[in-house]
């Protein structure tokens, strides 16, 4: 139920979120499905398995069933393909990670903090920068002070809205949103938007001379050349001069 307050806070400061839901758990203390579409508008709904089992101890075929059942339940409500996952209880194995693409999953978040801002090397074992109770403001201050444009920086905060037990917890998150939100130099994106954008960026087609680039994708991609920024619109070829 705390998702309602958290989404309102995110919306106020322009923060985007990904919300991992279990389609098969009882709902007396959970937000009813009838509210999902409106509540999570502008954010992403992603999988967390159907019943939240410890999947590293489950048969692989039953893990597949958990993921697909959750996808189908969430997609039936949200009306779009659900392509992300947070491992339940942080439980995973290399075999599970290798299985997920065949189940339509493009990324999966593990438990733990990096306290770093680098892009992940493997989106199937995506570790966040920090939990919302672990150096949130300290990491946030370091993030907004970054300035080297030759790197791709990302700050990713994970956690659970039910862990906000006191007004002090909510005040801390609002401080972070005030610090990090509404910045013109920051793209506020959901998990799947980041994954899709990076995949599309990798598909850009450059001339051998490096003076033109074609974008075969369905969204604009931005590149920087010699300090100048170029928007490469979908389906267009742009001269980099």
Task: Enumerate the predicted regions with their spans.
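Metal-dependent polysaccharide deacetylase catalytic core of the NodB/CE4 family, i.e.
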Residues: 13-106, 112-130, 153-161
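C-terminal domain-boundary segment and adjacent tail
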Residues: 12, 27, 75, 107-116, ...
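A Trp-anchored, charged/polar loop motif used as the substrate-binding/catalytic surface
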Residues: 131-146
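Short acidic, Gly/Ser-rich segments with clustered Asp/Glu that frequently serve as metal-coordination loops
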Residues: 1-5
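Short coil/turn linker and secondary-structure boundary residues
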Residues: 31, 58, 135-138, 168, ...
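Non-membrane alpha-helical structural segments and their capping/turn regions in soluble enzymes
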Residues: 60-65, 137, 167-170, 174
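Generic hydrophobic alpha-helical segments
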Residues: 6, 70, 140-144
């Amino acid at each position: 139920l705390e998702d309602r307050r958290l989404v309102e806070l995110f919306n106020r400061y322009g923060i985007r979120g990904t919300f991992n839901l279990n389609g098969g758990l009882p709902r007396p203390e959970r937000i009813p499905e009838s509210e999902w579409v409106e509540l999570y508008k502008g954010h992403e709904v992603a999988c967390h398995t159907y019943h939240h089992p410890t999947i590293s101890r489950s048969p692989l075929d039953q893990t597949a069933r958990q993921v697909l059942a959750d996808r189908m339940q969430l997609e039936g409500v949200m009306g779009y393909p659900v392509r992300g996952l947070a491992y339940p209880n942080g439980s995973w194995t290399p075999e599970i990670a290798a299985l997920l693409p065949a189940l339509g999953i493009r990324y999966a978040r593990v438990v733990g903090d990096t306290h770093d801002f680098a892009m992940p090397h493997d989106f199937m074992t995506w570790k966040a920068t920090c939990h919302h109770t672990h150096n949130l403001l300290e990491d946030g201050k370091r993030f907004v002070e970054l300035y080297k444009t030759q790197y791709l920086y990302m700050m990713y905060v994970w956690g659970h809205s039910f862990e906000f037990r006191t007004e002090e917890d909510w005040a801390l998150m609002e401080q972070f949103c005030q610090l990090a939100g509404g910045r013109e130099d920051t793209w506020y994106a959901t998990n799947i938007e980041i994954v899709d954008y990076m995949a599309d960026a990798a598909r850009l087609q450059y001339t051998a001379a490096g003076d033109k680039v074609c974008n075969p994708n369905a969204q604009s991609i931005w590149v920087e050349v010699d300090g100048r920024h170029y928007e490469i619109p979908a389906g267009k070829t742009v001269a980099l001069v």
